[in-house]
Amino acid sequence: MNILGIETSCDETSGAVLCSGQVRSNVVSSQRCHAHFGGVVPELASREHERLIVSIVDAAVTEANITKNDLDVIAATAGPGLIGAVMVGLCFAQGMAYALQIPFVPVNHIEAHIFSPFIQEDPFHSSPEGAFVSLTVSGGHTLLSVVEPDLSYSVIGRTLDDAAGEAFDKTGKMLGLPYPAGPVIDKLAEKGDPAFHLFPRALTSKSQTSKNYLGNFDFSFSGLKTSVLTWLQKQSAEFIEHHKADIAASIQYAIVSVLVEKTIAAARSRGIKSVSIAGGVSANSALRRAMKEACKREGITLHVPGTVYSTDNAAMIATLAALKLSRGMKAECCYNIAPYASFAAGSRMA
């Protein structure tokens, strides 16, 4: 089965082709026009998707060494995301499916991230056999979920305010770093001391290390942003510039340590021995390293996506569509799917 995946939920325009469960192409174009504004401008994002989507899809099909007539199914992000951006990819995908008279599969962007760690040579043979705890962390979402083998899942924790990725970007902006600041902080922090300044770690407690922890798995990062801003305002420009790497490392520790502690506590409290991390922030080297070390101590198997699959991409859209179809979802020629902006967790991905 040949599946075309399309992703346009934010500021990446992507097309990918999956042939018999294997990724044959994954073309991604990241929009650079937003850097000047220090964040994604929704209207600009929509216009860029509209400008690029035809060439991106053509490139994905060509790279896969097939033609559009060889496609069996088309899948696209239906949400959550910037509503205008989602509409571009969704309408294009539905129109293309209608023209080719093939089924269309709408895909939830966050659910696709959850399964992105299993995009390998054969994603279905690398999927965990039992339940796993998924940390999905990006610029717009921070979710902790328990995923069952039948693809049913429940969200057990989420951010109450800002996502972890937003915390990276906004605190980085306070340090004068370019957008997106997350990767810059990651690189800068390699030269810094994470214990230079202890910023607050909200909604954490020593009780989370308990095997019987039954507390709150929610996250909060707005307080961290306020704390960083207040602390920086008390320092001189020379001090900040001289210790920029140390400050970046301290900010990164405050975010990463909370993500790791809550994920491990969730797995431990439920007796689950498999954990995955996904989303743009899963590319952070400190998060990968800390989660790997924590999982090793606990005897937990860690699933992490390749860095190319951490950020938004269409390969994860096509992969989840293929996984749904392999689990019995009926693909239909339905072209009236409406886009949606927010994430509402369902009980089953299929």
From Swiss-Prot:
Where does the protein principally reside?
A: cytoplasm
Kindly state what the record says about how the cofactor is bound. Answer: Binds 1 Fe(2+) ion per subunit.
An example of a Gene Ontology cellular component annotation for this protein is: cytoplasm
Q: Which cysteines are joined by disulfide bonds?
A: none
Q: Which residues form a coiled coil?
A: none
Q: Which residues bind Fe cation?
A: 109, 113, 312
Q: Where in the cell is it found?
A: Cytoplasm
Q: Catalyzes what? A: L-threonylcarbamoyladenylate + adenosine(37) in tRNA = N(6)-L-threonylcarbamoyladenosine(37) in tRNA + AMP + H(+)
* EC assignment: 2.3.1.234
Which UniProt keywords are present, listed alphabetically? Acyltransferase, Cytoplasm, Iron, Metal-binding, Transferase, tRNA processing
**A Pfam family matched by this chain, by name?**
TsaD
In the record, biological process GO terms are: tRNA threonylcarbamoyladenosine modification
Which CDD domains does this entry report, sorted A to Z? ASKHA_NBD_TsaD_bac
What does this protein do, in the record's words? Required for the formation of a threonylcarbamoyl group on adenosine at position 37 (t(6)A37) in tRNAs that read codons beginning with adenine. Is involved in the transfer of the threonylcarbamoyl moiety of threonylcarbamoyl-AMP (TC-AMP) to the N6 group of A37, together with TsaE and TsaB. TsaD likely plays a direct catalytic role in this reaction.
UniProt similarity note: Belongs to the KAE1 / TsaD family.
Please give the name of this protein. tRNA N6-adenosine threonylcarbamoyltransferase
